[in-house]
């Protein structure tokens, strides 16, 4: 089970986008996530007449390591780490600071 999953709201802890908030769009491998509006790079693309794509500079979302992001706790309004707790025989993600279950 992953502590940070797709559609979680996260805050960036380090790097050029420190403090930015965004939603996880997808996981890349086990240790990287792509966050909406964070770590955007400019990529040059060639025109392709077969697909009708025009060339130029395109913004591309790049992966960021999961250790550089933390879950956003709406109750406190701050970044929070996630842990796991056994509730009725099921493994549930909880916020480390409050022990409340993470809303999906």
Swiss-Prot record:
Example GO molecular function: structural constituent of ribosome
InterPro entries: Rib_uL2_dom2, Ribosomal_uL24, Ribosomal_uL24_KOW, Translation_prot_SH3-like_sf
Functional summary from the UniProt entry: One of two assembly initiator proteins, it binds directly to the 5'-end of the 23S rRNA, where it nucleates assembly of the 50S subunit.
Upper taxonomic lineage: Bacteria, Pseudomonadati, Pseudomonadota, Betaproteobacteria, Burkholderiales
NCBIfam families, sorted: rplX_bact
Pfam families associated with the record: ribosomal_L24
Full protein name: Large ribosomal subunit protein uL24
Keywords associated with the record: Ribonucleoprotein, Ribosomal protein, RNA-binding, rRNA-binding
Entry-linked CDD domains: KOW_RPL26 (cd06089)
